[in-house]
Amino acid sequence: MKINNYIIRRKSKKIYIKNVPIGGDSPISVQSMTNTCTTDINSTISQINKLQKAGADIVRVSIPTLEAAESFKIIKRNVSIPIVADIHFDYRIALKAAEYGADCLRINPGNIGKLNRIISVVSTAKEKKLPIRIGVNSGSLEKDIENKYGINNPKSLFESAMRHVNILEKLNFDMFKVSVKSSDVLTCVQSYKLLASKIDQPLHLGITESGSMLHGSIKSSIGIGLLLSEGIGDTLRVSLAADPIEEVKVGFSILRSLNIRKRGINFIACPTCSRQEFDVINVVNVLEKRLEDVITPMNVSVIGCMVNGLGEANRADIGISGSRNKSILFENGLRNNNKINNEEIIDKLEKYIRKKVKILNLKNNC
């Protein structure tokens, strides 16, 4: 399937996590994961709702104990977004999560246990019509595979995934997606490429334990971006040691940068130099914060001088090009007769952007 003029998407089977389609011709979905203690029910519900408001399509919740599974039961009743139950070590927790309304089960081949336990989980998933995610991670590989290939080897992640893909296929279960995550970008990318060439199940993209807000965003953007640019990937999570809401923002920014899926404002801003006629950095940072609630796709250019300001403004929905004392406003590439006083750019530009959002929304709803 052709996504745009540059990307042809890999053909994959379509599955559903509640009402969200994954794979096939579905939009590439953005996921995040709660970092609250699951037994803190109110905090977990609150964070799930915030993630949904931020644009997450799916939220994953860790269930480390049977006690947490009881909390999950209450949490699930009080949220509407699709929830993936994240299960490690104890297969009984997966059975409980399925009973309590999970929309998908994530199991880790490296620690879920023997074949009979996997069969039990798959049997329950079949009964409940629940999809499963086979979530392979370089930090928790099966010991025999780790000894065979080592940790940061694409073949180790691939073999672990295929071992469990084969098990699920033998059990006539095809409602599953797969991830092969490593904290090493190139290992991760090559693992996904191996997997994409072998199976047609949906692939969940991510760089595991990628790091802080800054470095994790960079690593995830490179790794996930490389795969998406080759048409690989059906859903993604940007893993950051940061507020999970930032994961959603970065995820959509990656998709927007590749013209795969657009949500919210794409700010085009110059890095600034001595030619700038107003404080570009402050203007962009303040506007990004003020306009976080905008989900309508649009391009806004904020350029501090006339060198590139006119050209960028010509291609934007709303653009400002720096000029002495008063800067030039553009809408749909056309110069607006009203210049904006440089001291008032933030407030005036926000006003014009929100007005444009209303116009675009009316147009889209016609």
Curated annotation (Swiss-Prot):
Reactions accelerated catalytically: (2E)-4-hydroxy-3-methylbut-2-enyl diphosphate + oxidized [flavodoxin] + H2O + 2 H(+) = 2-C-methyl-D-erythritol 2,4-cyclic diphosphate + reduced [flavodoxin]
Cofactor binding summary note: Binds 1 [4Fe-4S] cluster.
GO BP terms, alphabetized: isopentenyl diphosphate biosynthetic process, methylerythritol 4-phosphate pathway; terpenoid biosynthetic process
Positions annotated to bind [4Fe-4S] cluster: 270, 273, 305, 312
Named cofactor requirement(s): [4Fe-4S] cluster
TM spans (from-to): none
Pathway annotation: Isoprenoid biosynthesis; isopentenyl diphosphate biosynthesis via DXP pathway; isopentenyl diphosphate from 1-deoxy-D-xylulose 5-phosphate: step 5/6
Alphabetized Gene3D superfamilies for the sequence: Dihydropteroate synthase-like, Sulfite Reductase Hemoprotein, domain 1
One example GO MF annotation: 4 iron, 4 sulfur cluster binding
EC number in record: 1.17.7.3
Record keywords, A-Z: 4Fe-4S, Iron, Iron-sulfur, Isoprene biosynthesis, Metal-binding, Oxidoreductase
Job description of the protein: Converts 2C-methyl-D-erythritol 2,4-cyclodiphosphate (ME-2,4cPP) into 1-hydroxy-2-methyl-2-(E)-butenyl 4-diphosphate.
Family assignment from sequence similarity: Belongs to the IspG family.
Listed name of the protein: 4-hydroxy-3-methylbut-2-en-1-yl diphosphate synthase (flavodoxin)
Source species of the chain: Wigglesworthia glossinidia brevipalpis
